[in-house]
């Protein structure tokens, strides 16, 4: 399941300073691909891990290019891709509509990753907001996220400077940043996604690499192993605060973060729906909820 990892190799692609709060003892590298349904399925776990233990780690998303190795998938029929997505949705609880491969297939596997790197040029948080919007457009709305107009729409929804984003999309900087991610992926010998690699402050210690999707408690145990003690989890914020921050979430995400069943999460969300705090958004597999922001003009 997990394996010891010798450590980060010397590379200009690694940040010269730890990301975010330099007092945090752990650094986590999450290897993903924006087209990967299993990476999308890990979102509830990452949200919960960040809320409960984020004070102990910085998290860096690395685009692995795994799905972008398109030549290996050219022989895969759209029907098989669609079936794989449906299977992933049923297994993870995060909806993804496989019929996109039959109706509106992604025309280029590299464009979404380059777009994410272009968005990151407006800041790490901007990049993460853009990644989320891109995933929503792909997995829920069945949009071809290699299309420039779709990517521009994602940029608008993520609150980016769209003109700057479109310029950066075709800049050497975005391409170089993506190449850095591919180099890190190769150096850390990542050949499956999602993969999480954990390092602590002691550069002589081995890291831990875990590939695939696992129950939440497994990731907590890995953090405890790297810290050398079992930390107390932080409590999640009030539900309305959580929704106000993330804006658009799945019932599955609410259930995981608050340790509720899907039915319990649905019940709590319906209470907020009656108060006109959220809007229910049915999707192919389950339900999403959009926060209604009364503070907007």
Curated annotation (Swiss-Prot):
Protein's UniProt keywords contain RNA-binding: no
InterPro entries noted in UniProt: Adapter_SpxH, Thioredoxin-like_sf
Record-linked Pfam families: Thioredoxin_5
Keywords in alphabetical order: Cytoplasm
Residues annotated as signal peptide: none
Compartmental location: Cytoplasm
Organism domain of life: Bacteria
Disulfide bonds: none
Gene Ontology CC annotations of this record: cytoplasm
Predominant location: cytoplasm
Domain comment, as recorded: Contains a DsbA-like thioredoxin domain connected via a linker to a C-terminal domain reminiscent of the winged helix-turn-helix fold.
Function as written in the Swiss-Prot or TrEMBL entry: Adapter protein required for efficient degradation of Spx by ClpXP under non-stress conditions. Interaction with Spx stabilizes Spx and exposes the C-terminus of Spx for recognition and proteolysis by ClpXP.
Assembly information from the UniProt record: Monomer. Interacts with Spx.
Family label: Belongs to the SpxH family.
Protein name as it appears in the record: ClpXP adapter protein SpxH
Organism: Geobacillus kaustophilus (strain HTA426)
Highest classification ranks of the organism: Bacteria, Bacillati, Bacillota, Bacilli, Bacillales
